[in-house]
Amino acid sequence: MDHRSKELFERAQQLIPGGVNSPVRACLGVDSDPLFVAHAKGSHLTTVDGTSFVDYVQSWGPMLLGHAHPVVASAIHAAVDRGTSYGAPCEDEVVLAEAVIDALPGVEMVRMVNSGTEATMSALRLARGVTGRNKVVKFVGCYHGHADAFLASAGSGVATLSIPGTPGVPEATVRDTLLAPYNDLTAVAELFTLHGKDIAAIIVEPVAGNMGLVLPMNGFLQGLRDLCTEHGALLIFDEVITGFRVNYGGAQKRFDITPDLTTLGKIIGGGLPVGAYGGRADLMRRIAPCGEVYQAGTLSGNPLAMAAGIATLAELKKSDYDALEARVAALATELQAILAAKGVPVRVNTIASMFTVFFTDQPVTDFASAKTANAALYTSYYKQMRDKGIYLAPSPFEAAMVSFAHTDADLAALLDAARAITLSA
C-alpha cells in the first residue's frame, strides 16, 4: 500500500539523518514508517502512493484554514511573480505587522523572523538584555523550539524519542534554565524565592501543546503574571501553537492575560517558514537597530511569507471560531465515549480546535500525568486509524488539529474509524 513511501524513506535514510528533517516525522514513537506526502488540499493530504487521508496534523497546527486555501494560494502566486526574496523592506511587512498588532493585546511592536525557534530564542535574548539577568523559568514538557536554553525536559520530539539530558548544550546554559511542573504555581514561587534576582523571564505555552494538549488550571496564568510583575521578570507567552488558533487574539485574549512578550509561528504566514516575536513597545525598542539587543535575518520579512500571512489573517478574522470550537468539543466528547466503551482508560483533553487522546484514567494536567498514558495503546490507536484513512500525529505527546476546512463528513470519518478499531488494555 505504501511502497513508494517506503522506497523514498529508504533512500532518505542514506542521505538525511534518520531519513527526516525533523525527528518526530520518522514515526519512531508509533513504531511506523513515515508517509511521504505528494499534495494536500483543505482537510486532506495525499501520499506519493495515491492514498488520501483526513489530516488531523495540519502541518502541526498552522493550517487553520486548511491546506492550499485558495485566497492564500493566490496571494502566494502573486507574490512569486514580484520576486521571492529582496533582502530589503517591503510594504507587506508593514501590513502584516499592523494585522498582528491589531489582533494581539500584548503586542505593540513586532519583529518578523523565520521560525518559532528563532522567535523564542530572540525573545529570551531580549528579556535577558533588558533585565540584565540570565535565568529563565520553563515548564517540564513544554517545547519552545530547539534553542539550547529550551531543550531541558522538553516536550514534542524530545519527549517522543525519550532523549535523555541535553547533549551538545553547555552545562552553564542548562544551569540557567529553571524547571517547574506545568500548572504548579507553588513550584514557580519557590524558584523566585531562590533565584528571583537572577530570573529574566518565565516562558510558557499558555495552553501546553507539546506534552499532548494540557490546559492551564484556573489562576495559573494570572499567577505567573503576578510573580513576574512582583519580581521584575518578563512573562513570555509562547503562542506558536495557540496564536490565532484558540482565538483570533490568541490565548492572551482568550484568558485575558497580557504578557510582556509573545512569540508566534507559521500560522502568521499561512504555514510558510515564518515566525515573529512582539510585545511592549518599550521592550521592542531595545532591539537593534534602535537598541542594543542584536537579532537579524536575511529572510526575515520574506515577501512570500508576508503575502501569505496577510491573506491568512484576513480570512481568519472573519471566521467563526465559536462554531468550530463547538464542533470539536462535540467530536472530543463522542470520541472519548467510543474509546471508553472499548474498555480502555482514556481522557480526551480539548480546547478550541485542538484535542489529544490520552490513554490514562487520571486527569492530565502536567507532563508527569501525561506520561502515565499508555504509549503502546496510542501506537495501536495510531496505526489502526491510519489504516482507516485518518492521519494523526505520530506521537502521544502532540495535539490533533482541526481546521475550518474540516467538514462534518471529515469529523464523522474519524469517529467511524474509532468505532471500527480494536483496543485492549
From Swiss-Prot:
UniProt keyword Isomerase present: yes
EC numbers: 5.4.3.8
Similarity remark: Belongs to the class-III pyridoxal-phosphate-dependent aminotransferase family. HemL subfamily.
Pfam families: Aminotran_3 (PF00202)
Protein name in UniProt: Glutamate-1-semialdehyde 2,1-aminomutase
Listed cofactors: pyridoxal 5'-phosphate
Molecular function GO terms recorded: glutamate-1-semialdehyde 2,1-aminomutase activity; pyridoxal phosphate binding; transaminase activity
Top-level enzyme category: isomerase
The keyword Isomerase belongs to this UniProt entry's keyword annotation: yes
An annotated GO cellular component: cytoplasm
Gene (name only): hemL
Cell compartment(s), UniProt: Cytoplasm
Residues modified to N6-(pyridoxal phosphate)lysine: 266
Binding partners and assembly: Homodimer.
Alphabetical keyword list: Cytoplasm, Isomerase, Porphyrin biosynthesis, Pyridoxal phosphate
Reaction catalysed by this enzyme: (S)-4-amino-5-oxopentanoate = 5-aminolevulinate
Top-rank lineage group of the source organism: Bacteria
Annotated NCBIfam families: hemL (TIGR00713), PRK00062.1 (NF000818)
Taxonomic classification: Bacteria, Pseudomonadati, Thermodesulfobacteriota, Desulfovibrionia, Desulfovibrionales
Membrane spanning residue stretches: none
Associated pathway: Porphyrin-containing compound metabolism; protoporphyrin-IX biosynthesis; 5-aminolevulinate from L-glutamyl-tRNA(Glu): step 2/2
Biological-process GO terms, alphabetical: protoporphyrinogen IX biosynthetic process
